[in-house]
UniProtKB/Swiss-Prot annotation:
Pathway: Cofactor biosynthesis; pyridoxine 5'-phosphate biosynthesis; pyridoxine 5'-phosphate from D-erythrose 4-phosphate: step 5/5. PANTHER family: PYRIDOXINE 5'-PHOSPHATE SYNTHASE. The lineage of its organism: Bacteria, Pseudomonadati, Pseudomonadota, Gammaproteobacteria, Chromatiales. This is Pyridoxine 5'-phosphate synthase. GO terms for cellular component: cytosol. Catalyzes the complicated ring closure reaction between the two acyclic compounds 1-deoxy-D-xylulose-5-phosphate (DXP) and 3-amino-2-oxopropyl phosphate (1-amino-acetone-3-phosphate or AAP) to form pyridoxine 5'-phosphate (PNP) and inorganic phosphate. CDD domains: PNPsynthase. Homooctamer; tetramer of dimers. Keywords: Cytoplasm, Pyridoxine biosynthesis, Transferase.
Amino acid sequence: MNTQTALRLGVNIDHIATIRQARGTPYPDLVEAVRIVEEAGADIITLHLREDRRHIQDRDVEMLRERITTGMNLEMAATEEMQAIALRIRPQACCIVPERREELTTEGGLDVLGQEARLKAFCAPLLAAGIEVSLFVEPDLAHLDAALRIGAPVVELHTGAYASAAPGPDREAHLERIVAAAAHGHARGLVVNAGHGLDYENVLPIAAIPVMHELNIGHAIVARALFTGIGEAVRAMRAAMDRARR
């Protein structure tokens, strides 16, 4: 029996906003960027409203909620402020991530084991509002089991350690953890996504995991867009993911 699921591409637009915020200009226009990204094959648009507002701004979330035609995946910390924003904006999906002001980017998965009760209470009103809630977790079986107890229907596996490892035994070991975690979560009814640090090469083994549902990728796509344009960068990532599934 073929258990392979259709693989979705979530394009993270944070670093398009980073370029805008570097000079405080009205460009690049995120609405136009999203239009091109969606036409090029993105299945969902991901954006992270950080507490320090270093790239995505509140007005972006409000405006894009009305303009995105595929779906909005709002990444956010588990704070009262972010919960209130999500309940007001009602994105199609939200991903709960850990956050530290001094980090350059999200550095790891949520400590779901250490704050299980808190996360369950945090997620409950989001789920009740019809928002698809995912938890950004390490590829660890105990964390996936905790996500189930919390009630989140989706997990996003943190691929940062895999992506940062040099090709060879170390990266293979990280890949094996991700494969095992994906199978474990899928067997227990979780929808399994993945993301962080994925590029046009290291995405291939992750995309090849049969039960993987969605990959969220941003920095590599925006970096390639400097040379090819954002539409072609998205199409190239979509093509790489499709090759891995053949």
